Amino acid sequence: MNPLFIAHKHYGSLLLLLILIVVLVALFKGPNTKLQRIVAVLVDINLVVGIVAFFQTARPISWFHPILALAAVALLHIGAKSEDKSKVVRCFSLALLLLVAAWAVNASWGPEWFKLNFVKLPAAAVIVK
């Protein structure tokens, strides 16, 4: 298995925990803009690693995975600079749900419909007939 894909997978799991920590910190202590910005940038890094891994592996990926991930990144950056508690909690909580949905799209336990519709093979894939 591609090492970048493995890094993307495990790093993404860690990021879900970090996003949950941001939500809990915002709820109990108030928004921490430094932590919020760091987590948003870390998710950006994982997005880039995922894009590079996509072009280096022959694994089919559903289009829903990057769409949901990009929507989550947008919400993370919207909430990252905010000091408004409700905005931070809403943005980061919704981003967490979107990232879990993006994870479920390609996970073995995820819905089968996502694996059959809007699936894109990377350019490096070799299709055998």
What are these regions (language model features)?
Residues 1-129:
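Polytopic transmembrane helical bundles with strong interfacial aromatic enrichment
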